[in-house]
UniProtKB/Swiss-Prot annotation:
PANTHER family: KPL2-RELATED, SPERM FLAGELLAR PROTEIN 2. The gene is SPEF2. Residues 1324-1676 are annotated as: Interaction with IFT20. Residues 227-260, 321-396, 732-758, 871-909, 1686-1712 form a coiled coil. It is found in: Cell projection, Cilium, Flagellum; Cytoplasm; Golgi apparatus. This is Sperm flagellar protein 2. Residues 921-930, 949-968, 1278-1292, 1303-1314, 1688-1708 have a biased composition (Basic and acidic residues). It comes from Homo sapiens (Human).
Length: 1822
């Protein structure tokens, strides 16, 4: 079942993943393949949502989507089935797939789609199914574990398996250990047994030796018995007999030796004698014989000598042996004699020997035991060394691992810090980039609004916002703010305040938009009122509480104070220790100081009685310390060092603890009583507080640490240098330490300096100079700069040295003590190193900035060098700093000495004389009168600063009567020109003083100058408390008013730009509004084109058409005129809007508000000066009932100002309205005049507004001048009252003048006389007793009064000058702004007029162009096919639109194939293929049936056109002959081969081309199925292609030439394809076997074999000659018998000859390894039709018999060649078999039949007879 399903899935459905029976459950466990199967049947529309994953979420998703579809198909599927499939339960997936297969087959048979199946369900069932699906999803979600749980289970299982393996390994190791132990135990037991056995054996040997050593002494009586005597005699006899026998044997042996020697000698003598005789006989015969005899004699003599030597040697050996035997006998006899001793001696000897043996054994045992002990000691020592080495190695490994872990942790922290810095930098850059983009878009927007001319003010404001990181675009509306504004609204408020402040600074400093014009630059007044600034500064000092004077030592100390900072382990302490050896410095370490303070508390260190005052000071300092701790304690600035804990002290806990220390009584265990605690030293008290904090597990706060440091510094002698070690470490500690050492706080100093400068409008130059900051607490700060890696490596080096030190041989107690002591320190160092480095990196930037400002005392040193070099560098720096401090102190001492000397010299000089008295009052009045007379001439407009000095000297003689005249003169003309045209020369105050009659006295200093001494008389205490808030109110109201007005002006600028852009764009849109001209043009064109063709040349018709064109032109011109009038009216409406007047009125009101603010400030300042100087003169200030002067605002017509009229006076605007002058006619001339009048009205209204601004400015200027004149008059009246002896003649004109100036002075005089009326009686009482002291006092008071008056009037006149200058500047800017606004608006109005005129002219021109085109077509009598488009000012001929269609184009007929030379067309070939395919689908048909079909097609050709004309004359014998050529095995015909032959001509392929085509097909057939589709067939192609050089005929009505070869390629696929499959499949190997046919039979077979094998098959040498002959004979046949066509015959002949020559050349050049390819039985049967053709018809038994014969022959051949199991055989071996050779030479299926012979013969016979049917003749003509 699984295999069937797998075949269904893999082959039929072709799923994305190959499924096998083994992996069936796993493949479907995710549900993805199930969704794919349903998707292929178009049932799963949401297959794209499926997830091809094995996670739980993917499975849940897939099965949730599968459940509705499976239930729709009727497959049983629930959560249990889904769970079984997911858990890969065997058989569940197979069962579901089988049910699904059955359901899908049913669905396929029914032909219903998924949508149709869903619609066929009932609604209730559908709802129920949806509920089931939801329930299914919920239950499945609970059943399937989450992926995290699954992963956890998998990890747990994996670790359980690992635990099992580890446990098994441990058990195995334990078992091996037990076995090893048992084996060792057994070996030990065997060794003990062997040892015991050896000991027992040794003991037995010793006992045996002892037993053998015991001599058994026989009894004495036994030697004397008869038997013993006889035995002794017998023994003696026997011995003697044996001796005799031995002697006899020896003697006989000697005799035998002698006899043998004699016999040998006799033999040799005989031989020599015989030889000599023979030699003598032959002596005379030959000399050689003699030589031989002589030689033999010599050899015999030599042999005798050798024998004698041997005999002698033998005798000597015997003699020596005999002597040795005798010697042994003698020794034996001697031993026997020696052994004949007593039994006691022998026993003693045996015992001694035994004792000696025992001693030797004991000695050996002791040596063995000592050796064992030595080995054991060596082994123990070596074990200890190995154990220590292993421990050291393990410690080293642990240390390296810890180092790597810390390094990774540090790298991770560094990466996080770098990432944080990067993110911060990235966010800043992104914010800046966003602001740049906003600025760019804002600029682009306003370039569009302002026509690329952005105002400077706008660009300046945008840049300010950009530089201050404020958003340029509006974030939220701030018009109505809620109670809790949002963040965006707060940002908008900040933006507004920033721009307001910038505008105010520009206004105040007269820069930017408020820069002075060229005509006002020369008359610029002083920027500051020094007198007013001095007054305000004095009042502010009076209002502030008195300061505590700072106590500074008179003589500075030469001691140097510094600190050495750096990271942990940067070498601070080491460097300071080395410095302490060379310099007398005191090193202060916070760790040591804290420990000493705690130790002092434990030691009860008490204050000595010499300083009893210190107790009270400490008691007072405790609450102060408590408050400081509460204020400065911050969790972020808590430092811990050494024993101090790293935890941060919370603020509340710290406060509670410190308050408890200050208020509550300590416990009895810690401090016995409060008195005893207060008797402790400061260090002990600080140590007590530190210990309390540390016991609670808290950190010591910075305040306590700083107190400990300061206490230690105070205990150091004054002239001794001190350096802090690693302190301070945070900015808070540095601030607290500097404040404790210097008594100054930088932040508080800045705040106090800002508070002291109360005023921004008036500054006291004497106090505005910057106060130098106090010198820092340290003279230098040295930073030892090391990297984090160096710090950590140093820590590791220290720990490594300690580890190596531990491994050295030490005393055990010392080692344990060192280990316990260093372990905590190392652990603390290792634990805190990362936090310390991070803390230093976090705090150092702030500390670096602190030590670099205001005086840079920071010195950085690279500490990553050796110790000696670093010490030298620090020594050089310390030496330099000591020298600097010494020079600095000496310089200070020299400065103090110089100051003392200067003070002493000044004290010795006489006091300077007081300044001379002022001139008498009448002279002053004359001067004032003269100067005022000179000012009666009119002044030019725009020069108010020239009038200000005259205001100072104006006398009271020109009173009320001349007010109007002066006002008229000051107003001048509206254009600013004077009436006389001349500017009189005016005198300044300096000039008036120069005219003084006293010329001898030097010129006194002017009030407000640097030489002027201000009046510092005491003022009432209540006055500063009132005047300081009053001035703050003045200043704040002035600044707020200015900011508000400037803000409105800024906002109005945006409004103006937006409005001007809006009216420009709206007017342009109005000009572009649609018109109806195109409708008239289209109607005219339709009428024009609808004219009949016969009327085009008629003159009357043309005249009528011209008239119609004129009518159309007039109508279009009327439309243009109407549009022009509407546009002019629209422009006039825009001009007549009240926007410009309202905007001008609002702008003037804003500038009038600025004037009002300046006027208010002047009035308030005048009142403040008056109150101040009156208070200094001890006068009672008079209440000013007069209301402040108000500048009227412009009344706007569009607003209701009834309410505001009660507060601010309004003046009406005089504007010229166009509606009051002209009515509203609609003619063009009236509109033109109306527009001109509108522009003139705009200009005239602007002149009226300009005059109104000038009048307002003159009114404000006059008000200021009158107030100053009134103040001067009041001062003169007071002086007249006080100077009683003055001349009454001089007073009368002054009184007359006062009446003319104002109406109110009489009332004031009455009020002033009331308080001053009491003074004359006092003056009258004193003249009787007048002393010199009183005269001097009166004189001093008069001088003081004159000085006060001068100072008061100078301050007031300065304010007048500044106010007049400000008012004129406001007037100038107002006129310039109004003029600029009117110019912009008028330019826009003129631009609108320009646009209107240009558009009207363009519309008229386009109408003229249309008229010209129409007249041209009328004259040429042609229709206008393309649309004429006229819209607004555009006219063109639209080539994309035609008003009537074009005539249809001529269509080229399709190509038609013609009959040529009896060749069948493609259509005829397809017709024959269809008929043959219906009768014989397999390609084989019987001979008779084939002949009958051809006869029927030829004879019964009733218009079917199945064959060409020359085929129609074939007779039955000729058709039978044709059949015989195609016959296979004498009974069958292959109709495919017939169609292949009849489709000629086509290029006959060479063998190489066939093989190349085969490789192409195999390359396309990726699955190597042997079949391809039509697309793959066309992609691969054949050895020939279609005709590419087809000529396209020029005549479009002529058809294209027919491409026969292209259609032949498609026909070959249809011919050989199997259409029973869908899509049709082509067996390309079978097709190429057909194309392998050749005129030569043998050649065709070899070509077929090459195609079947896939490579070239070489022919055998024997078969090459006959095949060549056959080829030549067959090649010659067509050339002779085919006279027509000659070209085709010649081409085919050449091709066949070339093929034959190549074959012969290949056969001649057969390589050695040719035909090594193997051929199987199936391939052989395919080549020789061994199993495919018998399937066509089963009724032909003979055919089956033949096929069976081939198969049996092939089997026998394979068996003969050694292939028992029919395995493939090499082609070379196969071709050598006779059966194969015979079959190749006789097989004729691969021979090309030549049917052209029959056709040519038929034509020849028909031509000779001359018989042709008329129908055929006509067909041939066609």
């Amino acid at each position: 079942m699984s295999e069937i399903l797998c075949q269904w899935l893999n082959k039929e459905l072709k799923v994305s993943r190959t499924v096998s029976p083994k992996s069936f459950a796993k493949a479907f466990s995710s549900g993805y393949l199930l969704g794919e199967v349903l998707h292929k049947f178009e049932l799963q529309d949401d297959f794209s949502e499926f997830l091809d994953s094995r996670v739980s979420s993917a499975k849940l998703n897939n099965f949730s989507r599968l459940e509705p579809t499976l239930n729709l198909l009727g497959v049983q599927f629930d959560q249990n089935v889904a769970h079984g499939i997911i858990t890969e339960k065997p058989g569940v997936a197979t069962k579901l797939l089988y049910q699904l297969y059955i359901a899908l087959q049913k669905k396929k048979k029914s032909g219903l789609t998924g949508v149709e199946m869903q619609t066929m369900q009932r609604l209730t069932n559908l709802r129920l199914q949806n509920m089931k699906s939801d329930t299914f999803q919920e239950r499945l979600r609970h059943m399937i574990p989450r992926q995290t749980d699954f992963n956890l289970m998998r990890i747990t299982y994996r670790f359980q398996e690992k635990y099992k393996h580890v446990k098994e390994d441990l058990a195995h190791l334990h078992f091996e250990k037990l076995e090893r132990f048992q084996k060792l135990k057994e070996e030990q037991r065997c060794f003990d047994i062997e040892k015991q056995y050896l000991n027992r054996r040794r003991q037995n040997e010793i006992m045996a030796k002892i037993q053998a050593a015991i001599i058994q002494i026989p009894k004495p009586a036994s030697n004397r018995t008869l038997k013993a005597l006889e035995a002794q005699k017998m023994m003696k006899k026997k011995k003697e007999a044996e001796d005799v026998a031995d002697e006899i044997k020896k003697f006989e042996a000697l005799i035998k030796k002698d006899l043998q020697a004699k016999e040998s000698a006799s033999k040799t003598s005989l031989d020599t004698a015989g030889q000599t005789t023979t030699d003598l006989l032959n002596t005379y015969s030959d000399d050689e014989y003699i030589k031989k005899i002589q030689k033999r004699l010599e050899e015999d003599a030599f042999a005798r000598e050798q024998r004698e030597k041997r005999r002698r040697k033998l005798l000597m050996d015997q003699l020596i042996a005999h002597e040795a035997q005798e010697e042994a006998y003698r020794e034996e006899q001697l031993i026997n004699r020696l052994m004949r001793q007593s039994q006691q001696e022998r026993r003693i000897a045996v015992q001694l020997m035994h004792v000696r043996h025992e001693k030797e054994v004991l000695w050996q045992n002791r040596i063995f035991r000592e050796k064992q002990h030595e080995e054991r000691r060596l082994k123990d020592f070596q074990d200890a060394l190995d154990r220590e080495a292993a421990l050291a190695k393990q410690a080293k490994i642990d240390f390296e691992e810890q180092f790597l872990k810390e390094k990774r942790f540090h790298d991770q922290i560094a990466v996080e810090r770098a990432q944080a810095r990067y993110e911060k930098h990235y966010s800043v850059c992104a914010e800046i980039l966003d602001q740049i983009v906003d600025l760019s878009t804002k600029v682009a927007d306003y370039r569009m609004l302002t026509n690329n001319l952005i105002p400077y003010k706008l660009m300046h404001d945008w840049k300010e916002l950009f530089f201050n990181a404020k958003p340029i675009y509006e974030q939220a509306s701030v018009k109505t703010l809620p109670a809790n504004p949002s963040r965006e609204q707060l940002t908008e408020l900040e933006k507004r305040d920033l721009l307001d402040t910038n505008d105010y600074e520009e206004y105040k400093n007269m820069v930017g938009e408020w820069a002075l014009p060229e005509e006002m630059v020369d008359n610029l007044p002083p920027s500051n009122n020094c007198i007013l600034g001095h007054i305000l500064h004095r009042l502010a000092e009076k209002s502030l509480p008195p300061r505590a004077e700072s106590t500074t030592p008179e003589l500075p100390s030469f001691a140097v104070k510094g600190c050495l900072l750096g990271k942990t382990l940067s070498g601070k302490t080491t460097i300071l220790r080395s410095l302490q050896k060379d310099f007398p410095i005191q090193i202060l370490s916070i760790d040591t100081l804290v420990q000493e303070a705690i130790q002092a508390f434990h030691d009860n260190e008490k204050v000595s009685e010499v300083l009893p005052i210190q107790k009270n000071d400490e008691e007072d300092a405790l609450p102060v310390l408590q408050e400081e701790i509460k204020e400065s304690q911050d969790p972020q600035h808590v430092f811990s060092a050494g024993p101090v804990s790293d935890e941060v002290l919370p603020e509340t806990e710290g406060e509670t603890m410190l308050s408890a220390n200050a208020d509550k009584t300590p416990k009895a265990e810690e401090v016995k009583s409060s008195d005893s605690f207060l008797k402790l030293t400061t260090r002990a008290q600080l140590g007590a507080k530190s210990e309390q904090l540390l016991k609670k597990g808290k950190s010591i706060p910075d305040v306590l640490l700083v107190d400990i440091i300061v206490n230690a510094i105070n205990e150091i002698p004054v002239n001794q240098d001190c350096i802090l070690d690693g302190f301070p470490m945070t900015l808070n500690q540095a601030q607290l330490l500097e404040e404790a050492l210097t008594g100054c706080n930088r932040n508080l100093t800045e705040v106090e300096r800002k508070k002291a400068q109360k005023s921004t409008l008036a500054i006291d130059p004497a106090t505005s100079k910057e106060i130098p900051l106090p010198s820092p607490a340290f003279d230098f700060v040295i930073l030892l700069d090391v990297s984090d890696t160096s710090s950590m490596s140093r820590m590791n080096d220290i720990i490594a040295e300690e580890l190596s030190y531990k491994t050295a041989h030490e005393d055990i107690s010392q080692r344990v003590a060192a280990e316990n002591q260093d372990k905590d320190g190392d652990q603390n160092l290792r634990d805190q190193i990362q936090h310390r480095i991070i803390g230093f990196l976090d705090n150092w930037p702030l500390l670096e900035q602190w030590f670099s400002e205001p005086e840079n005392i920071l010195i950085k040193i690279n500490a990553e060098i050796d110790k000696e070099s670093l010490c030298e560098k620090v020594k050089e720096i310390l030496t330099t700093e000591i020298a600097k401090k010494k020079n600095k102190v000496e310089k200070k001492l020299e400065e103090k000495e110089a100051e003392k000397k200067a003070a002493a010299s000044l004290a010795e000089l006489p006091l300077p004389t007081p300044p001379p008295a002022p001139p008498p009052e009448p002279e002053k009045e004359k001067e004032i009168h003269q100067s005022h007379v000179a000012s009666k001439t009119p002044t030019a407009k725009g020069k108010p600063q020239s009038e200000a000095p005259h205001g100072k000297q104006e006398s009271l003689q020109e009173g009320k009567g001349k007010k109007g005249e002066t006002a008229l003169k000051r107003k001048g003309s509206p254009k600013g020109k004077s009436s006389g045209g001349k500017v009189p020369v005016k005198k300044s105050p300096a000039d008036s003083t120069d005219t003084s009659p006293v010329a001898i006295v030097p010129q006194p200093p002017k009030p407000g100058s640097e030489e002027w001494v201000y009046v510092n008389e005491p003022v009432p205490e209540e006055m500063p408390l009132f005047l300081v808030p009053y001035w703050e109110l003045i200043e704040n109201s002035y600044i707020n008013t200015i900011k508000t007005v400037l803000r409105h002006l800024r906002e109005d600028q945006h409004t103006v730009l937006a409005y001007l852009y809006e009216i420009r764009t709206s007017f342009q849109e109005f000009l572009k509004r649609p018109d109806h001209k195109q409708d008239f043009v289209a109607q005219w064109q339709a009428d024009f084109n609808s004219l009949p063709d016969d009327l085009w040349d008629d003159e009357e018709t043309k005249a009528e058409l011209h008239q119609r064109v004129n009518d159309l032109r007039d109508r279009l011109w009327d439309i243009c005129d109407a549009r022009k009038e509407e546009a002019e009216q629209e422009r006039l409406d825009i001009i007549n809007e009240s926007w410009l007047q309202d905007t001008l009125g609002m702008t003037m009101n804003h500038f009038f508000s600025l004037m009002q603010a300046e006027l208010n400030r002047f009035q308030d300042t005048k009142r403040l000066l008056q109150d101040y100087y009156w208070g200094m003169e001890s006068k009672i200030p008079v209440e000013d009932n007069k209301r402040f002067t108000r500048i009227p605002l412009v009344q706007l017509d569009s607003k209701d100002n009834s309410e505001s009229q009660l507060r601010i006076p309004l003046v009406p605007r005089i504007s010229i309205s166009l509606e009051t002058v002209t009515p509203k006619p609609k003619t063009k001339s009236v509109l033109k005049g109306k527009m001109d009048n509108s522009l003139e009205n705009v200009e005239s209204n602007f002149e009226a507004d300009e005059k109104l601004v000038m009048d307002t400015w003159q009114q404000a200027s006059l008000a200021v001048s009158h107030m100053v004149a009134a103040e001067i008059h009041q001062r003169l009246m007071e002086e007249e009252k006080e100077n009683q002896p003055a001349d009454p003649k001089e007073k009368s004109p002054q009184m007359g003048a006062n009446k003319k100036v104002k109406k109110e002075p009489p009332k004031k005089k009455q009020e002033d006389k009331k308080p001053k009326g009491k003074s004359p009686p006092m003056a009258e009482a004193t003249p009787v007793i007048v002393t010199t002291e009183e005269i001097a006092e009166i004189k001093r008071k008069n001088e003081l009064r004159v000085k006060i008056k001068e100072e008061h009037l100078a301050a007031l006149q300065f304010e007048e000058i500044a106010t007049q200058f400000r008012l004129e500047l406001i007037k100038t800017k107002a006129l310039a702004l109004l003029e600029d606004l009117v110019t912009k608006v008028v330019d826009v109005y003129k631009l609108m007029e320009k646009w209107l005129g240009e558009r009207y002219l363009n519309e008229m021109a386009s109408t003229e162009k249309l008229t010209d085109v129409a007249r041209y077509h009328i004259e040429t009598s042609t229709k206008i096919q393309n649309e004429l488009y006229l819209s607004q000012e555009d006219f063109f001929i639209n080539g994309n639109i035609k008003v009537f269609p074009d005539p249809p184009p001529s269509i080229r007929p399709p190509p038609v194939e013609k009959e040529e030379d009896g060749t069948l067309t493609i259509e005829q070939l397809d017709s024959l293929r269809d008929q043959f395919l219906d009768m014989a689908p397999k390609g084989i048909i019987g001979n008779k049936a084939f002949t009958d079909i051809l006869i029927d097609l030829v004879t019964l050709n009733l218009g079917t056109n199945n064959f060409p004309s020359n085929w129609m004359h074939l007779t039955q014998p000729e058709l039978q002959e044709l059949t015989s050529l195609l016959t296979v095995n004498s009974e069958f015909v292959d109709w495919r081969k017939f169609l292949l032959v009849t489709s000629m001509p086509w290029p006959i392929p060479l063998e190489e081309e066939l093989l190349e085509t085969l490789q192409k097909f195999k390359a396309v057939d990726k699955e190597q199925l042997g079949t391809i589709t039509f697309e793959q067939y066309m992609q691969a192609g054949l050895w020939f292609t279609g005709d590419e050089d087809i000529k396209i005929p020029e005549n479009p009505l002529e058809p294209l030439p027919f491409n026969r070869q292209e259609h032949l390629i498609e026909f070959f696929f249809r011919l050989f394809a199997d259409y029973e499959k869908d899509p049709p499949q082509l067996d390309y190997t079978q097709m190429l076997l057909y194309f392998a046919c050749h005129p030569d039979t043998v050649e065709g077979v070899y070509r077929a074999l090459s195609v079947a094998v896939g490579t070239h098959v070489f022919q055998q040498v024997k078969a090459s000659i006959p095949s060549a002959e056959k080829t030549s004979s067959t090649d010659a046949g067509p050339a002779e018998e085919f006279p027509e066509p000659e070209e085709n015959a010649a081409r085919e002949e050449r091709k066949l000859k070339d093929d034959t020559e190549k074959r012969e050349q290949k056969d001649e050049e057969i390589p050695e390894n040719a035909n090594n390819e193997k051929m199987s039985m199936e391939t052989l049967l395919k080549v020789f039709k061994g199993g495919s053709e018998a399937q066509d018809s089963n009724r032909f038994a003979s055919h089956l018999k033949i096929e069976n014969i081939y198969a049996e022959g092939f089997i026998k051949t394979f068996q003969d060649l050694g292939a028992k199991n029919l395995e493939p055989i090499e082609v070379a071996v196969l071709l050598k078999h006779p059966f194969i050779q015979d079959l190749i030479s006789n097989y004729s299926d691969y021979k090309f039949p030549d049917i052209k012979i029959i056709l040519q013969r038929s034509e020849h016979v028909q031509g000779s007879d001359g018989e042709r049917s008329p129908s055929r003749h006509t067909e041939e003509k066609k």
